[in-house]
């Protein structure tokens, strides 16, 4: 949930500015975010692992195998999804209401608040999409978190572990709880 809050705050703002502003390379940035929506989580985990490993550029922070590393990996996974989907909704809303905003000379921040309020339900759906991607993620979380009991073990990694150990009933029970979330 922390990863969703952190990444969505910045992603919605970036999606908003991509929708409203015209600038050089805008289309390339949009294509990049759309492509990153499908990045394999294991690749994200591997990149974060290399960054946070002892010999990596951020190794001095000693974040590997901590919940913070898991939040970083999940934030990176969620970020392009929320940027791309919020860009789409804001660009549609902007085309619909652009003349009204310009006629009343509403500033950028006021425009953002109005568009967020107008598309609130869709934004909640976007956030739930990001949350679903984060909560169902196994690979990146296992790589950077280490699946340490009572510290970095989450439901998806626990399901994987219990299945490998042959505790299929317990793994299925965890899976049902995960679906109900």
Q: Which stretches of residues belong to each language-model region?
A:
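Interhelical loop and adjacent transmembrane-helix boundary motif
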Residues: 142-180
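Interfacial helix-capping/hinge residues at the ends of transmembrane alpha-helices
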Residues: 14-15, 45, 98, 141, ...
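Membrane-water interface segments at the C-terminal ends of transmembrane alpha-helices
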Residues: 1-91, 118-138, 171-181
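Short cytoplasmic-facing helical segments at TM-TM junctions of multi-pass membrane proteins
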Residues: 85-123
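Juxtamembrane helix-boundary/capping and inter-helix hinge elements in multi-pass membrane proteins
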Residues: 21-26, 91-96, 106-108, 147-151, ...
């Amino acid at each position: 949930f922390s990863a969703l809050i952190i990444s969505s705050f910045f992603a919605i703002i970036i999606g908003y500015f991509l929708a409203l502003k015209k600038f050089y390379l805008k289309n390339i940035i949009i294509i990049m975010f759309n492509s990153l929506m499908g990045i394999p989580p294991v690749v994200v985990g591997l990149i974060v692992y290399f960054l946070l490993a002892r010999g990596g550029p951020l190794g001095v922070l000693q974040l590997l195998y901590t919940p913070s590393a898991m939040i970083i990996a999940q934030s990176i996974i969620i970020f392009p999804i929320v940027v791309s989907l919020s860009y789409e909704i804001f660009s549609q809303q902007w085309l619909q209401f652009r003349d009204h905003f310009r006629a009343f000379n509403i500033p950028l921040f006021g425009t953002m608040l109005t568009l967020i309020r107008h598309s609130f339900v869709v934004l909640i759906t976007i956030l739930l999409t990001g949350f679903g991607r984060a909560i169902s993620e196994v690979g990146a979380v296992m790589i950077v978190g280490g699946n340490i009991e009572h510290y970095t073990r989450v439901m998806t990694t626990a399901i994987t572990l219990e299945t490998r150990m042959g505790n299929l009933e317990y793994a299925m029970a965890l899976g049902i709880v995960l679906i109900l979330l």
